[in-house]
């Protein structure tokens, strides 16, 4: 039988994909509904596969994306809550 465990996704890959998604939305490449669909699919995949890193490293990377304008407040909240990284989570 094959191993059904999915390999975790690197923090660098997550950052790259979130930047690409944000740039596509800002440039008009993705309509709002297409962006929402892709964002939700990405979050689902991250929940299934996990991110390869500890909470501090992941949050540092996400904070950089927020600071640089790649994650708006709504996307930030959805991403961190969906991945269990919101305030008060361990």
Where are these regions (language model features)?
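Acidic, Ser/Pro/Thr-rich low-complexity regulatory regions
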Residues: 1-90
